[in-house]
Amino acid sequence: MRKGKTPIVFIPGLFGSMSNIIIPGTGNWSFGLSAFIYEPFIMMLESMGYERNKDLFICFYDWRQRIVFSTQKYLLQTIAYAKKITGCDKLNLICHSMGGLLGRSYVQSDEYKNDVNQLIILCTPNAESPPNYSYWTGGSLPIHASSKINIVHFYMEQYICYFSILHKMNKVEAIHIYFPGLQDVIPCKDYGNYLFIKSDSSITFLPYSKMKTKNPFLDILNTNRFIIQKRNIETTLIAGDGEETTQYLQVVPSHSKLKWTDGKVVGDLLTKHGDGNAVLHSIFLLEGNKYVLHASHNEVLYKSIPILQKIL
């Protein structure tokens, strides 16, 4: 163990944890199908001198559940365990993607125990990401931003199919019952208006305030985001850039009572100012030390190592 080094708790993103709780037969907690993404990153941290379960701890969690629930059940326990094993009263959180919302949910809460030195966020869309509207309200993403395979979208489509067949119900109904955490990752007020209707040559955006599909969890969390600085938690935000990323979704009126609450997704507008999953302005909603890397959502993990070597 590195003497004088602050212990790390790493929180992976959506689909970055797997166990019998999520899919029976998959065993104890692990990175599961995302091991090929996260294990190399953990090995890079180990090459910096950290040791797993000695001063490097992984917070696996049930990403199907609401973020507040996962924070209480999984993150608080992992932090308590890390403090007990190391004898340290402060640690650093390194969070990837959805994991950053768990980290924030803790450090911004009333239960915060003044035990986080640094909050390091990689690719977390702090105002979230438009494709999640499509999954939450329609059960699928009818459009694909790029010819490249998007791992997050691929896993999302497969998992939604799996549990809708398992529970013998339509996808949207199954999502709302068995994957409530997905509501916590649809765009919030701070993202801005993101659904638009096209008529002839004009584009009209649907105001977030008029939408039925909202993200109350993130709206509240972001209103209260300045408490992170007040609590003297050093914050670092690392984003990926240069990958085609969905910025807005084109919708048409839906006549279904079950699906597409605020419009059926039929198209999108892309930006290169993102990592393929998260746009820059969503990641950089928080105050902190900001870094932009020319990298995709997962490549940022590996390309961030020189930054982490400087700040840890």
Question: Where would I find each of the regions flagged by the language model?
Answer:
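N-terminal non-catalytic accessory region
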Residues: 1-151, 272-312
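Intrinsic-disorder/low-complexity loop/linker signature
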Residues: 26, 55, 183, 191-193, ...
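Alpha-helix C-cap/termination motif
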Residues: 48-51, 85, 109, 178, ...
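Alpha-helical scaffold elements lining the catalytic groove of polysaccharide deacetylases
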Residues: 70-73, 78, 189-198, 211
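Extended catalytic-interface subdomain
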Residues: 125, 129-206
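C-terminal subdomain of alpha/beta-hydrolase-fold enzymes, centered on the catalytic histidine
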Residues: 205-312
